[in-house]
Amino acid sequence: NAVDGFENQLATIRKLIEDEDSHALMGLLGHAQAARQHFNHMLAQKPFMENNKVTTQQFTILPGKKSFQGKFSVPGDKSVSHRSIMFGAIAEGTTHVTGFLEGEDALATLQAFRDMGVSIEGPKNGEVTIHGVGVNGLKAPASALYMGNSGTSMRLLSGMLSAQKFDSVMTGDASLSKRPMERIAKPLREMGAQIQTTGERGTPPVSITGNQALQGIHYDLPMASAQVKSGILLAGLWAAGETSVTEPEPTRDHTERMLRAFGYDVKTEGNRISLQGGGKLVGTEIQVPSDISSAAFFMVGAAITEGSDVTLEAVGINSTRTGVIEILKQMGADITVENERIAGGEPIADIRIQGTRTLKGIHMPEDQVPLAIDEFPALFIAAACAEGRTVLTGAAELRVKESDRIQVMADGLKTMGIDCTPTDDGIIIEGKGHSGEWGAIFTGGEIESHHDHRIAMSFSMAGLRTSGEIKIIGTETVATSFPTFTQLSNQAGLAIQVTE
């Protein structure tokens, strides 16, 4: 019971003090502090019903000619931050992470592993130290694991939790509770997992029965999804024999790269990725690169603003993520990639964008869609400022993100005077740009972001080319991926006013 648990914790603290084990003591006290904060956070912000959502923030951007200049470091990559915690937790020994993204989503992952008994120090100024418990060291959480708004956390953890000795339940906020989870549950069941999603649409909460013996699987992904691929591979760490995933097109490969950085052998042959179960991970140093998905807003802002000159420093340019650079280049943007180097197994570079010429409308290449899936809302703003028509196809995945990003972006673009037609798997946007002209493109208006951080940040960049005031409703979720967004945008010259 609770009293026994309290006595056990006191005994643990006494032993750590007697042994002068300061590392473990700091981790335990950090866990206690974080648990209290996390519980308060869940009480305040856990909205299972949309109409219970108490906190709504909005951005206001006034019209007027603006410049867009400066050198910036955007926050750490969210995908790499999630994985650094997950893999550090099940590694043997200590993992030290720098550049960790202290946003809501990555913190949900961190808290989940604290709830499963992992001692984690930080985060403080992007630094996290994880005292790994090994692949068999996770403990049953006392209650449901709360994933907030993070689909990555839930899908990857579905794979890991399916292989544990204990039962578990994962819940999320109102937005995550609408997102499809059967796409990961189905292959895990084929491996022998007992996993249940909720309702006809297979959404969270997700319930997993532990103590199942998993078998390796050879799975052909029906859609390009790095999250589903990663969930299967992570289950494969505990499965008997080989687990392989074949993807229809390449998706981001952070899981494969980071498993190798932790000493786990992962083979990639074309579009087939495989690993053998039963190995171990060894603690390491992870430097998290700046997030190209966050940098994308500044790339687009600079590309649509006359005379702009923006450099984004130490951005991750993993080849499975650089679709946004390729698409902007095809539209005619003045982008240079400088000072390329490797950090923590990931390629990084400085990206410079200058506003020297009007963008051109294009048919966005379908082979770039999985490589730019999170950047399309920002690219739609670029397309509206381009000369001529832009067509996107093959991007049905956008309809099941934090919001239906095709429909929500189309609604907002129409509100601000842009002619566009959403389709089942994309959109057609009639750009209002003219060669050599840099005047207003958007008329302004009130935009409903549907509490989707990428929608809110994308429409913020429209403020660089607007003739009327832009109000964006429901921007509080920007903190999930880019806590310093308004600060950096305003340093560059955008002038966003934030009201709670």
PLM features per residue range, with description:
Residues 49-500:
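Structural preference for solvent-exposed beta-strand-turn elements
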Residues 12-51:
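C-terminal helix-rich "cap/oligomerization" subdomain common to oxidoreductases
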